[in-house]
Amino acid sequence: MKTVTDYQNKNILVLGIAKSGYAAANLLKSLGANVIVNDGKPLANNELAAELQAKGMDVVCGGHPLELLERNIALVVKNPGIPYSNPLLVAATEKQIPIITEIELAYRISEAPFIGITGSNGKTTTTMLTFEMLKEGEKHPAIAGNIGTVACEVAQAAKANEVLVTELSSFQLMGVETFQPKIAAFLNLFEAHLDYHGTKKEYGLAKANIFKNQTAADYSVINADDADVMELSANSKGQKILFSTTKEIEDGACIKENALYFKGEKVVEIKDIVLPGKHNLENILAAMSIAKLLGVANEAIVAVLKRFTGVKHRLEYVTTIHNRKFYNDSKATNILATEKALSAFTSPVILLAGGLDRGNEFDDLIPYFEQHVKAIVTYGQTAPKLVHAAEKAGLAIIEAVHHLEEAVERAYAHSADGDVILLSPACASWDQFKTFEERGDIFIQAVHKLI
């Protein structure tokens, strides 16, 4: 960890606890800051807040009183999920108090360089692929951000010869000031998180912050097939490395002759890749580009691609019951992810979908329903909207239920020999579950109860 004295004896407000706030508060206290922790959850049933209080921090729970800003606050470190429309953040902005997220704090204290990976879909898969390729290539990677350990904790322990591979959300990237990844990858952009950002444009601009502080000594890995990503990355000062699944890229990564190439050199043949789904070729091209830029040998990249079958909750094979294959794609929290999941199958699909209503309509799914879906069982807040889209698609079997466990039972009842039963919600999980991981685990448990 760098020697950091900027926070000594400064009053710093950590807004929102969860994993990132808890880690940030502990880090700041270790750096000599006077840490004030604020969380909306009452202290009586807030275990993390109680732990921080026991460590001598000033903890205020049960609301976000504006009076906190009267304590000569030098900096606010906010939980990524708390919107900037929160009255406390609005008041802090008016007082010109800097507001950052935990990833910015991690960058400021890290000895190791960062790799940042963002996009609407494929972040987790690409981050894991990158980590595995760097590990195979003996580049001493550590993984942090939305997956793995909280970035602050990893950054504290990281040495200069390591590299931090981070999956970054738009929420995290809105709160960066000096964050400068050595390599920044922008995978794709799809309309998502409208409840937080308001418009696709604002969402895209938040993602593009990943390039904000890059210089000519850095690299920007960009999806050349995504017009929005190309536009949003146009002002990046990093060396641009493009990747494409549809056209040849001389100075980047592409597909030709049934193989993946980087800067004109064949790296791996597609037949050697075990990760299913055409969409995953984009993720592989991005990860391969990062690995090659850091000097990983082709042999190491090929070794990873011959064994990497995917990440949990992303098109995860669960089991086969009476020749019905079950797949868990709980990480599909937006429409594009579900489109890509459906496109991965040639067998008839019984789709389980639904969840938090973020204001999206689901008409974009209609052609995928028509081509791939035999029946749909919906649940959660968005069930009526999904039913409407399924009716437009002319699906013969459409059913809405209240809970995921019931949806699993009904999907199985509608299935036949050779069908795929797929959980790919196209929605966030927070209407009924704490996380998409919890949703996926409950799906898996419900499937095993059918046996």
Curated annotation (Swiss-Prot):
SUPFAM superfamilies: MurCD N-terminal domain, MurD-like peptide ligases, catalytic domain, MurD-like peptide ligases, peptide-binding domain. It is found in: Cytoplasm. ATP binds at residues 119-125. Gene3D superfamilies: Mur ligase, C-terminal domain (3.90.190.20), Mur-like, catalytic domain (3.40.1190.10), NAD(P)-binding Rossmann-like Domain (3.40.50.720). InterPro entries: Mur-like_cat_sf (IPR036565), Mur_ligase_C (IPR004101), Mur_ligase_C_dom_sf (IPR036615), Mur_ligase_cen (IPR013221), MurD (IPR005762). This is UDP-N-acetylmuramoylalanine--D-glutamate ligase. One of its GO terms (molecular function) is ATP binding. PANTHER family: UDP-N-ACETYLMURAMOYLALANINE--D-GLUTAMATE LIGASE (PTHR43692:SF1). It catalyses: UDP-N-acetyl-alpha-D-muramoyl-L-alanine + D-glutamate + ATP = UDP-N-acetyl-alpha-D-muramoyl-L-alanyl-D-glutamate + ADP + phosphate + H(+). Its EC number is 6.3.2.9. GO terms for biological process: cell division; cell wall organization; peptidoglycan biosynthetic process; regulation of cell shape. Pathway: Cell wall biogenesis; peptidoglycan biosynthesis. Belongs to the MurCDEF family. Cell wall formation. Catalyzes the addition of glutamate to the nucleotide precursor UDP-N-acetylmuramoyl-L-alanine (UMA). One of its GO terms (cellular component) is cytoplasm. Pfam families: Mur_ligase_C (PF02875), Mur_ligase_M (PF08245), MurD-like_N (PF21799). It comes from Bacillus cytotoxicus (strain DSM 22905 / CIP 110041 / 391-98 / NVH 391-98). Keywords: ATP-binding, Cell cycle, Cell division, Cell shape, Cell wall biogenesis/degradation, Cytoplasm, Ligase, Nucleotide-binding, Peptidoglycan synthesis.
